[in-house]
């Protein structure tokens, strides 16, 4: 009776991780986080004006998402801070390769 290696499930795990990641990205990018204005028949999420005989709605576009974003300048956006912090962490982790036994850098 020959010995056989166990089945390799890495392809399955990679496909499952990609599927879950794709579903999460699609769900996050397709949901609306804008404030809902109007009633069940008249929805004005991007601003606008609606008038009929008994009611009038004037709603202007949302200006900013939160108090973290002070303006429309690129250097005041929170995503820039995230990118800079990730780059700083990645660059600070690049140090000389140390020998795991003696904890010194050897020349090649």
UniProtKB/Swiss-Prot annotation:
Principal location: host cell
Keywords of this entry: Host endoplasmic reticulum, Host membrane, Membrane, Transmembrane, Transmembrane helix, Transport, Viral movement protein
Keyword Transport annotated: yes
Lumenal side: 30-72
Family listed: Belongs to the Tymovirales TGBp2 protein family.
Record's function text: Plays a role in viral cell-to-cell propagation, by facilitating genome transport to neighboring plant cells through plasmosdesmata,.
More details: TGBp1, TGBp2 and TGBp3 seem to act together for cell-to-cell propagation. TGBp1 is the main movement protein that physically cross the plasmodesma with the viral genome. TGBp2 and TGBp3 would facilitate TGBp1 function.
Protein name: Movement protein TGB2
